[in-house]
Amino acid sequence: MEGQNKSITFDGREIRLTTGLYAPQANGSVMIECGDTSLLVTATKTTKKEVSDFLPLICDYEEKLYAAGRIPGGFMRREGRPPERATLISRLIDRPMRPLFPSWMRDEIQIVASCLSLDERVPADILAVTGASIATLLGEIPFYGPMAAVRVGLIGDDFILNPSYREIEKGDLDIVVAGSKEGIVMIEAGANQLSEQDTIEAIDFGYEAVSELIKSQEDLLKDLGIKQVKPSEPEEDKTLPSFLEKNCTKPIELVLKKFDLSKEERDLELEKIKVETQGKIESLKDDNQLKVLLSENDKLLSSDFKKLTKKLMRSQIINDGKRVDGRDLDEVRKISASAGILPKRVHGSALFQRGLTQVLSTTTLGTPSDAQEMDDLNPSTEKTYLHHYNFPPYSVGETRPMRTPGRREIGHGALAERAIIPVLPGKETFPYVLRVVSEVLSSNGSTSMGSVCGSTLSLLDAGVPLKAPVSGTAMGLIKEGKEVRILTDIQGIEDFLGDMDFKVAGTDKGITALQMDMKITGLPVSIISDAIKKARPARLHILEKMQEAIEKPQETLSPHAPRLLSFRIDPELIGTVIGPGGRTIKGITERTNTKIDIEDGGIVTIASHDGAAAEEAQKIIEGLTRKVHEGEIFPGVVTRIIPIGAFVEILPGKEGMVHISQLSEARVERVEDVVRQGDEVTVRVREIDSRGRINLTLRGVGQNGGMSYPEPTPTPVAPLS
C-alpha cells in the first residue's frame, strides 16, 4: 500500500498529510498530523433512500485512550459512551461544515475524526475541523469549501496561534475561528472579561491564519490532480412556489404584521393558511400537475411554505425595520428575574425569563470529593464547576420520550459553563465544588443565554462570591445581497429563518464567552464586529434587570449546605496527617464526623455540616503539623502507660513520652505511682531526637495547671492567597 505524503508549513510548524493510504472505502480520507498528534479523518456519502427536508449530516469525533498511552478504567477496560469532550468536538466539526453543504443536498454524509495519538502541545480539535474539510474535498463531495479553523490565545498583550493546553490555561482567551473564502462561518470562545475591541482583533488575527490554510488546501488539490466538485443546484420545479406566492403572500404578510400575536397564536394562524392552501390543492383535478407533484412528495408543501414565510419575514425586517413581535432591531424582550424561589434545601435558586423563554437554575454546593473526574484525553483531571442544561419537551409544547442529554443539551451546558468560569472565586477563598442545573421551562430562543443569566442569579443566591455578574444575549442577522440587518435578542422564529445565531456573554467589564453559528457560507469580520459591539448595550440592560433581583451574594449559606474550612500545611507534613495506611486521617474523620481532602500542594479542606466539628478537625491537623521546640511547656493528658514511662498528648494528635526517670525529682519505682491514664499534667519538651520523637519531662515543671507556657510557634507556610 502506498499513499501520498504532503506537508504544510504553518506558523512555524509542519502539518503532515497522508492521502490515499488509509480507509480506502471512504469517499475521502486523510491522516493529518502535527507534532505527535495524529488524526484519521474520513468523509463518506451515501444516497438517502427516504426523502427528507434537511441535510442528514453526521459529524463524529472519537478518541481512544491508547492515543495517550492509557488503559480505560472500569471493569471492561474499554471505552464506553463518548465523553463530553468528544461530543463538544463533534459539534465543533459539525457547526462550520454544515453551512458549506448545499441546502438542497439530501444525501447522507458522515465525517468521522479519530484521534490516534495526542501531543499535549497540539490539541486535536483544530486539526479535526480542518481535516474534515480536506477529507470532504478529497472525496469529491459537493461542498462550498475549503474551510479551515485555528485557535487564538492571548498571553499578556500577544496573540498566540494554536496555543498548547498549558498556554490555553495560562492565557486570557481561548477562541476558535473557522472560515471559508467567503468569510467566517463559526466562532467558539471563552475569555477572561476581554474587551470587545480585543475580541474583534483576535477574530481578525485568526481569520488571517484561516486564509493561509484555505490556500494550502487549494494547492493540495492541485498537487493531487483533484478537481473540486462545486455544488450545482438541480433545476427546481416552480409550480408549487409560484402557486404559494400567488395564494399565500398577502395572508402571510398580514400575520407577520400582527405584532400583538403570541408565538402560539402566530404559529396557529400560519398553520391555518397552510391547511387552507392544502385544501385548495386537494380540490384540483387528479391529473393536475401540482396535485401529482404533492402526491409524490407529501413534505414538499411544508418545505416550500416555510421558504415563503422566511422570505416575507426577512423582507419585512430589511424594508420596514420591524420584527414579527413589533420590536425594533436593537430592542430586548421584556425581562423578569427572581432569586431564592425554592426552599433552602436547594442551596441556591433563581428564575429568569426573557419573553417566552423561561429558565429555572439551581446551585448545589459540594465538597472537593464531589469534583468530576475526567477520563478522557484532556490533560485536566477533574472539574470543580459543572453546568448541566436540560431541555424537556414541554418547554416547546411537545410530547416525546425523555432521554439522556443529547449533543444540543451538552453543548448549551458547556457554553453556559464557559461563560461563568472566569468570574468564579478561587478555591482558596471558596473551596466548594459547584453544580448548576438549568431547567428550560419554556423556550422561544436563546435558552443558553437565559441559562447564563439564571446561573448567575442562582450562584449569588447560594452565597457564591462571584467576581462580577454575567449576562448574555443572542444576536441574529438578516443578509440579502448588500443589505444587512443585525437583530438583538432573537426569538425562535428569527433564529430559524435568519442567517446567524451569535451568542455573547460577559460582565460589565468584558466578554466571557462567544458562540457564533452561520447558515450562509461566511461573513466578513466587519459585520461580526458590528454584532459584538451592538450586543454590549443589550447585555448591560439585562444585567441591570438581574441586579434588581439580587445585587450581591447572600451573606450566609443555606443551613443545609456543607461547611468547609480551608487552610494550608507544609506539604512535607502531608504524610504525618495521613499516617501509616491512612490510619491517622481516618481516625480524625471518624472522631469529628467530617470529610477531609488534602491536595499535593498542602491545601487542606475540611467539610462538615457542623462548624464546630470542622474546627475540631482543623485543630487536630494543626497540632499534628505544628513544630514543637525544645524548652516549650504544654498542658497535656496522659494517654497511655508503659513500664518505662507515660505518653502525653501535648497537642491534638501529637504525643510525646515522659521517661520514668523524668516523672519526678525523686526515684520512681512504678509509673502508676505518679501518673495514671487520663491525668492532666504540665510537661516541658526536653528534647527532640534524630527520629523526630518528642521526649518530655515533668521535672522542674509546676503541676498546678495554671502556669504560663510559650504560645505555640506555627509552622511557617505560604499564605492562602
Swiss-Prot record:
Keyword set, alphabetical order: Cytoplasm, Magnesium, Metal-binding, Nucleotidyltransferase, RNA-binding, Transferase
Reaction(s) catalysed (UniProt annotation): RNA(n+1) + phosphate = RNA(n) + a ribonucleoside 5'-diphosphate
A GO CC term attached to the entry: cytosol
Molecular-function GO terms, alphabetical: 3'-5'-RNA exonuclease activity; magnesium ion binding; polyribonucleotide nucleotidyltransferase activity; RNA binding
Disordered: region residues: 702-721
Pfam families for this protein: KH_1, PNPase, RNase_PH, RNase_PH_C, S1
Nucleotidyltransferase among keywords: yes
Cellular compartment(s): Cytoplasm
Entry keyword annotation includes ATP-binding: no
Segments forming domain S1 motif: 631-699
Ranges of residues in domain KH: 562-621
Family indicated by similarity: Belongs to the polyribonucleotide nucleotidyltransferase family.
Name of protein: Polyribonucleotide nucleotidyltransferase
